[in-house]
Amino acid sequence: MKSFLVDQDGYYGEFGGAYVPEILHKCVEELQNTYLDVIESEDFKKEFDQLLRDYVGRPSPLYPARRLSEKYGCKMYLKREDLNHTGAHKINNTIGQILLARRMGKKRIIAETGAGQHGVATATVCALMNMECIVYMGKTDVERQHINVEKMKMLGATVVPVTSGNMTLKDATNEAIRDWCCHPSDTYYIIGSTVGPHPYPDMVARLQSVISEEIKKQLQEKEGRDYPDYLIACVGGGSNAAGTIYHYIDDERVRIVLAEAGGKGIETGMTAATIQLGKMGIIHGARTFVIQNEDGQIEEPYSISAGLDYPGIGPMHANLADKKRAMVLAVNDDEAIRAAYELTRLEGIIPALESAHALGALEKITFKPEDVVVLTVSGRGDKDIETYLG
């Protein structure tokens, strides 16, 4: 049976690969040749696990959401990534990659960020490990995620506002790649999602796979079986979804539901529903679905959530959708906000806008009472309070 995980050439089916400018060939190749040896080594695992436990506060709870279960007629569990240090799943990946960068002798860490969660997580771990940190962030996002910008500065990072294009995540990523091209030898570029050239999508998925590793153990304890009927997660680039499904990706008993950002509606042109609207293309070094116009130019995506407005999608998820392994639902802005309020009023948990898209998918699915459903709350909603109240 063919696996839905990456093959030895860095592809998921026909998606993925590494399409990078000549100047970065060496960096990317060095990473491809190093990452598995390092992250599978005993001393890396030991240090990574210890930091996840003592610093991040893992394992994160698998919370039986009683009132949400009653509303949707199933057994609903929430995987609480919002309870991690820094408030989201992002830190699982930043700790792993910065440990790798340190072992590769890199001195300077650069990152891109949309909602600011990956930026904060990167700045946090750089402070912990005494590394220089530069974060690229679109000017639009700097304005709408002001509090995260202040946190990064307090942590000692340099935040560079990017003023090209739509001034959001795509543009921040372009700028970070430019920086990497200028400083290939001493700089490590830490990508925050399962996007970019191979090995990034696989590396980020492996570092985030701690999520599904814990779900297996926790379900065994709570349900007497280690798999759910449904796994539900939001996708922008796809890292929290990749972590949620990693250990179940080839298990046909488990249905995978991915919620992407519908924006103002997929027919409005104001959307980030890449899987439903995208055509095959290349973005940031990987072949995947990309929202583009007739001439193949990348379109500006839109979502109320700064963490989901990316015009591409991780190659793992593109392949899952293409092969019909995952069900993909577009959740609009107002559906996400409604779902966030519902979780807050039913369970007393304020989710991030990104996670609210996963919650917004619930009303689009018909569950059976015995269905065990695990939904990942990828982050907490503190950063989005103004949007919710607006």
Swiss-Prot record:
CDD domains linked to this entry: Trp-synth_B
UniProtKB keywords: Amino-acid biosynthesis, Aromatic amino acid biosynthesis, Lyase, Pyridoxal phosphate, Tryptophan biosynthesis
Residue numbers carrying N6-(pyridoxal phosphate)lysine: K90
Keyword Amino-acid biosynthesis: yes
Cofactors that this protein relies on: pyridoxal 5'-phosphate
The species this protein was found in: Bacteroides fragilis (strain ATCC 25285 / DSM 2151 / CCUG 4856 / JCM 11019 / LMG 10263 / NCTC 9343 / Onslow / VPI 2553 / EN-2)
Annotated family: Belongs to the TrpB family.
SUPFAM superfamilies from the UniProt entry: Tryptophan synthase beta subunit-like PLP-dependent enzymes (SSF53686)
Domain of life, source organism: Bacteria
GO cellular component: cytoplasm
Function comment: The beta subunit is responsible for the synthesis of L-tryptophan from indole and L-serine.
Gene3D superfamilies linked to this entry: 3.40.50.1100
EC number, as in UniProt: 4.2.1.20
Annotated pathway: Amino-acid biosynthesis; L-tryptophan biosynthesis; L-tryptophan from chorismate: step 5/5
Gene Ontology molecular function: tryptophan synthase activity
Subunit field text: Tetramer of two alpha and two beta chains.
Family annotation (InterPro entries): Trp_synth_b_CS, Trp_synth_beta, Trp_synth_beta/beta-like, TrpB-like_PALP, TrpB-like_PALP_sf
Stated name of the protein: Tryptophan synthase beta chain
Known catalytic reactions: (1S,2R)-1-C-(indol-3-yl)glycerol 3-phosphate + L-serine = D-glyceraldehyde 3-phosphate + L-tryptophan + H2O
HAMAP family: Trp_synth_beta (MF_00133)
